[in-house]
Structure formats: C-alpha cells, structure tokens
Amino acid sequence: MNPDLLNWLDNNKMCFNIIDEDVIEITGFGKMYYEDTSMIKSIFRTDADNNIKFNTMENIQTLQEEGINYIVFQFGDNWYYYDTRKDFEFQILKYVGNRKPLNHTQEFVNLGIHTPFELLNGSFSLTDWIKKAKYLGQSALGICDYNTMAATLILQKECEAAGIQWVFGYSLTFTDGIEKIDAKIYCQSQEGLQNLLRIQKCINVDSENKIIDLQDLLKHGAGNIIVFSKYASFWLKEIGNNLDRFFDSFDDCFYQLDLSEFKAERIDIKVLDATKCYFDYIYDTGDLPPVLICDCYYLDKDDAKNKIILNKIAEGAAHEQSDDQYFKDLDEHWNTMSGLFDEHKWDIEDIFNWACENTVKIAEGAKARYEIERNFMPQYDMADNEKSKYANRHEMFLDLLE
C-alpha cells in the first residue's frame, strides 16, 4: 500500500484497515481500490461514445462485485476518491467514515469561521465548513467575518439543510477616541440581529475608516454578546470598572482565548503577552470569562497556503502568516494551549473546560434568524415635502398610480 496514502489517512485521523496492497477499507464508509496514477499519462480517457471517464486500469464491474465501490487516487498534493456507482467527480478524501476517538470529548462549538465573503482572506464554502463541523460531532457553527454580514443568510440556509444550529457573528474594530480595539459580536435574538445590522451600517455607511465609535457600539448592544479580542487585555485592564458599560449594553461579555501560533516570533510574543495580562489581572475576577475562539481562515493545516495567496493578491504581501488558523478538533486545541501554562499555578483543565462551555453557551442562546418564508421589499422613506402632501406611503403610492 502506498505510504503517502497511509500518511494522509493518519494525518486526517481516519480509521482504516489495509485489506491488501491495492485495497483499503475506511471504517464506516467502505472499501477503496488504490489506483496508482503515476503509471498512467492521464487520469481521464474517452469511451466509444466520446464520454470522458476516469482512466482506471481495473474493471469497475469486477470491483463492485467484490464490494469495492470507491477508487482512491492522488492528484497533485491531495488524495481523492471516486464513487464508481455515480458519474465521475473529484471528492477529496476527508471527513468520511469514522474518525479516531478524541481524548477530549466535551461539547464545543467553533465560532471563529472566516468565510470567502471576507474577501481575499477567508476560504472554502460554507458547505465545506459545515461538513467538517458535523464530522467532528459539533452541533452548531458560528461565523465572524470582518466588517461584513454577507455570509449570514447563506449560513442559515446551509445549517438548516444540514440540521445544525447557526450563529451569526461579526468581527469589527471600535475606538474610544484614543485606542483601537478589536472585538466580535454574536447575535442572540431578533433584537440583536437588528442591532447588528445597525452596527454594520455605522461601519460600512457612516464611517469613513470602517471603524465604529464606542458610543455608537454601546447603543446597539442589546440582544448581542461581545467578545473582546485576544489583544484587548491591556486596554481592558486600563478601563477597570468602565467595563460595566459593556455589561449594561450587551447581553454578556467574554474574552477571546486564542493561542494559535504564528510564523513571526514578534506576533507570538504579542499574543502571549496579551494573554498573560488577561490571566494575571482579569481572569480571577470572574467578570470576563474566557471563550475558546480560534480564528479559522482555512479548513485544515495543509490549506494554510490559501490565506497567504489571497492576502498577496489583496495587498501584495501576506502579514501575520500562520499554519495554525484552521478548524481544529478539541485535542488539537488542547495541544495548542496546554504547554503554555504553568501547571503548578493554573488549573489548565478547568480553564479549557470553561472556555469550551462558553462556546456552547453562546451557540445555545443564538436564536436570531432571517424570515425567509415571505418576500419583502425595501421600505421607502418619504421626503419632508411628501410627508406634508400625503398621510402615509400607501396614500402616496395610490396617488402616483393615478
């Protein structure tokens, strides 16, 4: 059996059994015949009717009679499979069958997805993100695109179709007049969705620099949860009791626990210093609980190049490069953070569990949704002269028809 294929299966934590040198069984999915594409000039061929077919050296009917319905092959750097019972289609060999059991099995929801609607930064369709979420046994999925709500309606539709809960999130930058602070907003109710739309307007319509003023942000907190970014701890320490203004405005407040590793040491130091400040001065107060949100821009570790390429297209250079901003399972999250804490000073397991529980808390409270059962038109705002002439929009409409 090809060692590269076995490494691929191990890296993707898939359960499998080797039947013989050409056949492998993915537990919970089925048997696959290994096609060595290095032995052929092209993976495609045409049949007698000029239809394009997969160029397999094996007789498909014979494979099916032996209970082998899939052909697995390498194309480029990835491994794909083909269901011989259907028309040929590339299917990447991921998120199928049974996954190797995790050591950490508590409930957790990924709230850090950045979709392709965050242009030239996030990647992969929402269908792919949802597929991996379900493969990992997660019951909900949250997005947090920066300065855009473009993916929210599609998220709702895709999650409804897949039978999981959705969480509308939004990443932004606000200012107190001196400092600029990053945060995430997560909708909890219909009121929260309306307020998030108002926040979106403040940023993308009213603001010249796409940053919202703190006073405007606090006006639209009802029905929403705010999560302060991993870099915000120094500012949070400085404002002290003024944090109460956020609790008065928002339904709840959290601190983003994200210890993803970057390629540049200076960025890692910045993250670690900010996280240390949070645990030294804020964590023990219990006022601002941690929530485990890793900003995810690509599905798997081997997809990290996506963000680099997209950033170079957008700005000519890729800043804050990382191979660690992918959709992790809980064991991978644990491995990222456990080695960074002094086990004699901190109860790491307790911190980890609390941060995971808070992702579930946010997801369970997320009831905001778009009404898609009816069609709506934009509301017309009457000008002052129209208001003086007509009692309401309907009267104006009828008069204009005449």
Specify the residue positions occupied by each region the protein language model found.
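Mobile, glycine- and charge-enriched loop segments
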Residues: E21-K31, D36-N50, E89-N121
